[in-house]
Amino acid sequence: MSDPSGNSTTGIVRRSTTDASFSTDDQVKFTSQGGDNAWPCGDYLNIWVCDLSGGLLGYAQFPGGACNTDGVVIDYLYTGTTGSTPPFDLGRTATHEVGHYLNLRHIWGDANCGSDLVSDTPTHDNSHGGCPTHPYHTNACGGGTSPNGEMFMNYMDYTDDNCMNIFTSGQRTRMRNLFGAGGARLSLLSSQGCVSPVALDAGISAIISPTGTFCATTITPVVTLRN
């Protein structure tokens, strides 16, 4: 994997900051504000991990926004091997937020009985927490809206990590459409980050001058380099 300069990278950049925590104002996305600048959004999915204030687990930017703020932000307690804060300790915060990055809405449409713009998700009366027992809230938004109960196990709800386990076919299609012709995330498929770094193995193959013994305090060598 290559960084924006073409150098080999793990994709992880660590930054020391004097900011005790960050919020949803995107300061974490700018070096000048205590965070770290985004890599080019056409080539990389930027994920910032930091201390988020207010009990927030994470947030994301939908496709089509400003490139220098594009990506996902996750509280350090809820991601990686450091994330050990149940019931959000299985990585589903990243799954949920990357879902937003890939154009998925909350399954309840951010409104009572709202729409998430996906036809095969049942209508939800609201967000759900914990881990309800299935079937749950059958037809809570009216006859036929959720005959098998609301899909609280969907990654785009707010239930516990060990309760989430599904994207629907419609959600999958909505995400994949971003990588089709004209899609907002299409450029990621030809990302410069996937180009192997150029091996920096140049060396001196011959010394043209000086030759023999040379006792001057300074020299201007002429050499042949080969990569």
Model features per residue range: what roles?
Residues M1-S5, T10-L200:
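Extracellular (secreted or membrane-anchored) zinc-dependent metallopeptidases
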Residues V195-N227:
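Extracellular/luminal regions of secreted and cell-surface proteins that mediate adhesion/ECM remodeling
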